[in-house]
Amino acid sequence: MMPMDWEITFKGITYECINCAYCCSCKGWRIYLNYFDRLKLKDYEYAIEPCEGEFKYRLKVNEKGCVLLNNNLCRIHLEKGYEFKPLMCMIFPFSCMIKWDGTPLLIIKHYCSGIKKGKISKKVVNEAIELIKELYFDMFEEIIENGMEHSSKTEIFENFRVDWEEREDFGRYIFSSKTFDEMFERCREIFGNKINKLNLEEIDEIKNNLQRYNTKENEEEILRYLLELNRREHFRKLPFYREVNKLINIGNYLTKYKNVFKGEGEVDKKLFLNLK
């Protein structure tokens, strides 16, 4: 595989494992095994089941989560050591998405209870990237090909298209704002006489909620997370104005949380685990 640059979608946050075992037991999260995982786990065949999809096997779960979880401890880790754990376990809370131009995106999942403010080390980032490449191995080029866009244009509004680079610049400009007042002014710059395409009432509601719920101190973090979601490109299949409205709606949802990281975790559960 040709060497490639990765883009880090999160800035200003890091994580520290707090040994809560949530990643081993959260609803909707499954551990899929590649060929090398199967070789490492030959002594744990009783905990493996076949499945459909790009990976043919996964770990079994019960009502408490992974069947190899015992008193909040991993049986593999205890009996064999960290290096014998499945790759997906070692990668968490990181994962990968593919940008419109084929660039791999390193993401961090906010439903990990160890997410916190801070700067993540280059060592941790590089280890996560290497583990992801090992997990997908000879599938990675196909994943990139299938995940990227093959059209040079994207919709801003219905029937109005621009280059992907321009849309990316718009999103970065809007959501790098430090306050919602600044974000609104930047939206006015970008959308001009189409500003009414945005849910302006919800922007006002966000500012009111920051006062009502006494969460004004979370304003900058909420905007930082919205920029992170924009970098992940969850909503790039939508016209850009609808993506902005989606992110505004998420920002409004987060204003109700005193612990904003808990709210971000709930959003990420919906995005990654399809939990309602």
UniProtKB/Swiss-Prot annotation:
Annotated protein name in UniProt: Uncharacterized protein MJ0939
Family matches, as InterPro entries: Puta_zinc/iron-chelating_dom
Annotated organism of origin: Methanocaldococcus jannaschii (strain ATCC 43067 / DSM 2661 / JAL-1 / JCM 10045 / NBRC 100440) (Methanococcus jannaschii)
One Pfam family here: CxxCxxCC
